[in-house]
Design a protein with these regions (language model features):
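Bacterial Sec-dependent N-terminal signal peptides
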Residues: 1-26, 177
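Short N-terminal segments immediately surrounding and downstream of signal-peptide cleavage
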Residues: 23-39
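Signature of long, low-cysteine stretches enriched in small and polar/charged residues
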Residues: 35-66, 100-147
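Surface-exposed amphipathic alpha-helical segments
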Residues: 40-44, 97-111, 152-181
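A short, polar/proline- and glycine-enriched secondary-structure boundary/capping micro-motif
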Residues: 48-49, 56, 87-90, 165-170
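A short acidic-to-branched-hydrophobic micro-motif
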Residues: 60-98, 155-156
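Coil-to-beta-strand transition motifs
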Residues: 71-73, 126, 139, 148-155
Length: 181
């Protein structure tokens, strides 16, 4: 019995460690539904949020670069939200524009930013939007990608100083995102 407990504990520890797999300096984060690379291990804040649309399961992974760390960006964030199918699904093409507009407006308002640009994008055939916000009256920029995969919204965000916008780490983070089918 004691051996079984040790084996079980070892297995659980190995599974936990595998969810953060380092690649070079970057660390792969995996969920049941996606994977993405962060420059360092992010903080995991997951839970359920009670909203007018019902209880939503939300996973937030974030890494904020310390002032003394040589990183071109200030913060990296992945938010994964699961909506009830009755609220939104990527197959509901007639609802997509309004859903993305409301999502973009929400981030603009939450960050007190100014929308600089937006365009349509996609991942594996699922719809998305790419957005850029001005923050702090020109001092910082937020690059955002929204993807709606069935009833899951993924939001990838990077905040950087305006003079560092367009750096290679932005594309590395954004392009490392993959969904699991």
């Amino acid at each position: 019995m004691k051996t079984l407990k040790i084996i079980t504990a070892s297995f659980l520890l190995a599974c936990a460690m595998l969810s953060f797999v380092p690649v070079g300096e970057w660390i792969m984060i995996t969920t049941n539904n996606c994977k993405i690379y962060f420059p360092k291990k992010p903080t995991d804040r997951s839970g359920t949020v009670n909203t007018a649309k019902g209880n939503l399961k939300v996973n937030i992974y974030s890494y904020q670069a310390a002032a003394n760390v040589s990183d071109d960006n200030l913060a990296y964030i992945l938010t994964e939200t699961e909506y009830p199918d009755s609220v939104i699904n990527s197959d509901d093409e007639d609802k997509l524009d309004i859903f993305f507009k409301n999502s973009i407006d929400g981030i603009v308002n939450n960050f007190h930013g100014t929308l600089l640009s937006q365009s349509k994008t996609a991942i594996d055939g699922f719809p998305g939007r790419q957005v850029k916000l001005d923050l702090q009256q020109g001092k910082a920029v937020m690059n955002i990608r929204f993807y709606l995969v069935k009833n899951r919204m993924y939001i990838l965000e990077i905040i950087t100083n305006t003079n560092k916008d367009g750096n290679a780490a932005i594309e590395k983070f954004m392009n490392s995102f993959e969904i699991k089918n």
